[in-house]
Amino acid sequence: MRTADATADRCRDVYEIIEPDQRFAGKDRGIMLLEEKFLEFHRYASSHNLPLEAISVGDENKVLCEMHYAANAPRNIYSHTKSFTVTAVGLAMEEGKLSLEDHVAEVFEDKLPSNPDPNLEKIQLKHLLCMSSGFGKALLMNADRRPGIGAPDYEKYMMAQPVPVEPGSAFCYSSADSILAAHMVERAVGKRMGEYLYEKVFQPLDMGWPLWEHDPQGHPNGGGGMYLTCTEMMKLGQLYLAEGNWKGKQIVSRDWVQEVSTPKFTFEPSADPWHVGYGYQFWISPYPGSYRADGAFGQITTILPEKGLVVSIQCPERGNFDQVKRALHEHFLMEL
């Protein structure tokens, strides 16, 4: 395990002992400035004991800067997983197997109760993707799944829920929306999400086969529970930064990249500078044209198209993530 102190020592060796002219010899000035800002943030993080496990910065093709404050091992990325789910949705749509207008009640007709809520038939895939299903509360979150709420059949459980809010009219963050969207993909393509994403995304991006939480019926959890390293997590951001292209191969359509990153809901200004808006399974960030995949406790990939950069961080479940978020915002992302 590389400690923060050890990392700081290595940085001093690389950045402080070498003369500036030698330090940046042959490098693009933009990379030089990025490395300086990255090191400044690292020093701030170390001196303030920020609860960080890793931070990576990349462009479309490669990792530019990286620091680890804990073992470089796959960890739970929580709701960052949702952005992989919407990637699968886009792939299935491009194959003509799925549509944003598809109705949940029709797809899961075999799981409907005898007296479903009348609003259930109004819910479409597009409502699930922007968290406006109308169920009106957070469902199938980690705190629900752990004690077995909804088990063994999440589809049957959700079809029996009341829908008190007009679908599409209000934002309500819920993992159940993402889980249903993932199940719609599976029914459309005839494969489990893990297999589908492995063929279409994980394998082309050299990510292997990630460990992933499954429900009691064997469905991968479309709302969370995927395990990745920081740089593996960042690869999704690099794919979107490159408008769906990976090393010359178009993986996701440019139109879908634009669609998911366009705000479907915008929020009133608040004390949280990151609470800006929501697209399709991506949050909108407060930097020009930027958006992010965002998982609990600080598993975040921020895509900065105007800067040509992606920034990913991973944080432990313990500690004050708000402190990390403020520092990342004020001492790094705003400085780029």
Describe the residue ranges of each PLM region.
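Short, charged, amphipathic alpha-helices and their helix-cap/turn boundaries
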Residues: V63, M141-P167, K191-P210
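Active-site-proximal alpha-helical segments within enzyme catalytic domains
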Residues: L180-M184, G224-N245, Q299-C315
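Structured C-terminal helix/loop/strand segments within mature extracytoplasmic catalytic/sensor domains
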Residues: D28, N49, G295-L336
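Active-site helix/loop module of the DD-peptidase/beta-lactamase fold
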Residues: K97-F135, A160, A188-L228
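Active-site SXXK
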Residues: N61, N76-E101, L128, A181-V185, ...
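A short, well-structured edge-of-sheet supersecondary motif
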Residues: K37-A71, L100, T301-T302, G308-S312
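Active-site Gly/Thr loop motif
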Residues: W209, Q258-V310
